[in-house]
Amino acid sequence: MTPEHLPTEQYDAQLAEKVARLQSMMAPFSGLVPEVFRSPASHYRMRAEFRLWHDGDDLYHIMFDQQTKSRIRVDSFPAASQLINTLMKAMIAGVRDNHALRHKLFQIDYLTTLSNQAVVSLLYHKKLDEEWREAATALRDALRAQGLNVHLIGRATKTKIELDQDYIDERLPVAGKEMIYRQVENSFTQPNAAMNIQMLEWALEVTKDSKGDLLELYCGNGNFSLALARNFNRVLATEIAKPSVAAAQYNIAANHIDNVQIIRMAAEEFTQAMNGVREFNRLQGIDLKRYQCETIFVDPPRSGLDSETEKMVQAYPRILYISCNPETLCKNLETLSQTHTVSRLALFDQFPYTHHMECGVLLTAK
């Protein structure tokens, strides 16, 4: 695979290899055949980052070969959304001959939605001044005149210039209901929107007969907790990043959800609070004992759950675990399988044509 060519004819074979690999990895914990969720074969990534290469008068996006580290020119990127591909050409055309925009530009980041909104961030090794702002405003207006719903941001050391806003609002159809998700530039969002819809619908399906409340750790912008709110009496969710917490609060209001509470704290801190080890001012007014959480949802970073959180989640009758790294999932399962059984297993092809796998497991207490 190269950045400008996807081996779409090999999609089925690469997916089958992942299914076999996941089943083998999970064999010590479950004999289940994974439920498999396919990605679109192209134009599935909603965000992308490129370095910029200045070659005389020419200017173009580049990526680096992961093995050789050699530079690869990228004029089109079929893994990314159609909107990103359109913007890549439009941005180069708008920046190439404009000194204020081109000088010391080293990277462009693209974030798009299925609702055809975009935030484009231009990263510089220079101080951004009023001349840059005027040139960027003119470029933004020219892009909008082409029918592109785009917002531009300039970034440099200790500097961030928003021409109007640093977010876009995604709209996803999830199990018969449209969900609105504010996505903030430079914050984590699910990269494959079509796969995100399938993950949300799978999570809804496996928790459809739930009792009591839901606790979620690492909730981000509320991606899962807001969609799952319809299956539970109440949802209590934690997140550490301020922009993500602010986006989650907006998303709660935008979706008219009244049974979700977001707390800004790390999973490790929440574990301490639940165990009565420490008290936190951020929990004032929230009585944790009022929540009857029979299900806990975790979507941890690639490192998986730390040992203290492992112990904490074992106290819940049901654990819903979304993993972007099955190796650390299996490491966690060495502990979790002592008290819980894997009752559902799913593979989500979040990153086609790569080694990476995303998977979900539902664990029920023995």
Swiss-Prot record:
Keyword S-adenosyl-L-methionine: yes
GO molecular function, one term: tRNA binding
Catalytic activity, as annotated: uridine(54) in tRNA + S-adenosyl-L-methionine = 5-methyluridine(54) in tRNA + S-adenosyl-L-homocysteine + H(+); uridine(341) in tmRNA + S-adenosyl-L-methionine = 5-methyluridine(341) in tmRNA + S-adenosyl-L-homocysteine + H(+)
Top-level EC class: transferase
Keywords: Methyltransferase, S-adenosyl-L-methionine, Transferase, tRNA processing
UniProt function note: Dual-specificity methyltransferase that catalyzes the formation of 5-methyluridine at position 54 (m5U54) in all tRNAs, and that of position 341 (m5U341) in tmRNA (transfer-mRNA).
Name of this protein: tRNA/tmRNA (uracil-C(5))-methyltransferase
Species name: Salmonella arizonae (strain ATCC BAA-731 / CDC346-86 / RSK2980)
Organism lineage string: Bacteria, Pseudomonadati, Pseudomonadota, Gammaproteobacteria, Enterobacterales
